[in-house]
């Protein structure tokens, strides 16, 4: 990326299981690249640079211009900030550190998205893969909810699990896999519905 963009790269980081030290063989390589600006030709240059990298098939992540990142939804920036391990640069030089209000927004908007997708999937798609993806997404909502209650962000699933009880703990356990479609859909739906009511803005 340095050869493709020179001094335009304001930040490079890594997210996901590799950032948390929980990666398995074949886990995605979630890279964050923030440039001073990002136009469509820059996307093409990113793609060309990525083609030469080893394990290209695992590469994914987030690419943005600095102004777009600063204008991003604060609730989404909460998880983005806390889930990103810096490799080059500091996110704090680009965005303010997200706080408790941003965490509340993350819980509410995340729960709304899960609620809608879960009900749609149960009624129409009946897709176990989509349910698994929603359960994985719930982990970000759970981290934000835990932050609201403790003031601490727990990246590790094991550390997070130690602090959760009740429906929160049940959803996290379902996100680890092997859940029955009907039962897991019910638990996830009821959990998301409760959070929407609790965190209504």
Predicted regions and their residues:
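Catalytic core of pol beta-like nucleotidyltransferases
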Residues: 1-3, 7, 19-26, 36-201
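Short, glycine- and small/hydrophobic-rich beta-strand elements in well-ordered beta-sheets
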Residues: 7-15
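N-terminal loops that bind phosphate or other acidic moieties
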Residues: 30
């Amino acid at each position: 990326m340095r050869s493709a963009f020179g001094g335009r790269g304001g930040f490079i980081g890594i997210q996901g299981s590799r950032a948390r030290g929980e990666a398995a063989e074949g886990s995605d390589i979630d890279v964050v690249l923030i440039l001073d600006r990002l136009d469509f030709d820059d996307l093409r240059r990113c793609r060309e640079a990525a083609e030469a990298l080893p394990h290209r098939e695992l590469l994914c992540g987030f690419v943005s211009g600095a102004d777009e990142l600063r204008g991003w939804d604060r609730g989404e920036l909460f998880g983005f900030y806390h889930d990103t391990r810096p490799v080059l640069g500091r996110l704090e030089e680009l965005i303010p550190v997200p706080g408790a209000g941003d965490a509340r927004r993350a819980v509410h908007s995340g729960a709304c998205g899960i609620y809608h997708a879960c009900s749609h999937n149960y009624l129409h798609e009946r897709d176990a893969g989509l349910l698994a993806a929603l359960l994985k997404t719930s982990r970000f909502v759970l981290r934000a909810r835990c932050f609201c209650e403790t003031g601490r962000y727990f990246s590790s699933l094991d550390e997070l699990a130690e602090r959760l009880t009740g429906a929160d703990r049940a959803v996290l356990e379902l996100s680890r896999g092997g859940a029955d479609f009907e039962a897991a859909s019910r638990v996830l739906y009821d959990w998301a519905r409760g959070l929407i009511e609790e965190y209504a803005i």
